A protein has these predicted regions:
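Second-shell loop/turn segments in exported
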Residues: 36-41, 109-112, 120-121, 135-137
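Short, small/polar residue-rich loop motifs at catalytic or cofactor-binding pockets
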Residues: 10, 116-119
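A short, structured loop/turn motif at beta-sheet edges
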Residues: 55, 97, 125-129
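Hydrophobic membrane-insertion alpha-helices, especially the h-region
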Residues: 14-27
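N-terminal export/targeting and maturation segments
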Residues: 2-6, 25-83
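Mature extracytoplasmic domains of secretory-pathway proteins
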Residues: 58-116
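Short, structured surface segments that line ligand/substrate-binding pockets
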Residues: 12-13, 110
Length: 155
């Protein structure tokens, strides 16, 4: 039979305890350093939606041109997948709401640079949270883009 005998030293014990504490702290802190999803953007009321658009630089008519309830498909394919990619660019969680009923609010934009009319802002809302949005032009050669106000080109 073998007997092992060892003696713990206070310095070594303290160093081991400190290393363990540091390792535990890193395990708890590092996950919090990962990129977090953006905080939900409130959009449950007209005032919330108008404040959001105004904060981005848009001037819109206060009353929506259209309010429409939509059931998003379970799997976002084709045009819906393209739209989800546009929302991901804006850090909006549109794709997370696949298969759910959402409400789209459409507002007339009155200050799109160089285009005095025919521009609209769409906001998709689920519950009280903004989940997506875009700016569209209804002109013959129209466009669809993010909600970000376009940069002005200086001469």
């Amino acid at each position: 039979m073998f007997v092992y005998h060892f003696r713990l030293r206070k310095g070594l014990t303290a160093a081991a305890a400190a290393a363990f504490t540091l390792l535990l702290a890193l395990l708890l802190v590092l996950p919090g350093c990962q990129k977090q999803d953006a905080a939900p953007i409130p959009a449950g009321t007209d005032a919330d939606r108008l404040a959001y658009l105004t904060g981005l630089g848009w001037t819109v008519e206060e009353t929506p041109v259209e309010t429409l309830d939509l059931l998003l498909p379970e799997k976002l394919k084709d045009d819906w997948a393209n739209y989800a990619a546009l929302q991901k660019e804006q850090n909006l969680p549109f794709a997370d709401f696949a298969g759910q009923t959402v409400r789209r609010y459409t507002y007339t934009v009155t200050n799109y640079p160089g285009i005095p009319e025919g521009v609209q802002a769409n906001l998709f809302v689920c519950g009280d949270q903004l989940i997506g949005g875009d700016i569209i032009s209804l002109a013959e050669n129209g466009f669809q883009t993010t909600l970000n106000f376009p940069e002005q080109k200086t001469a």
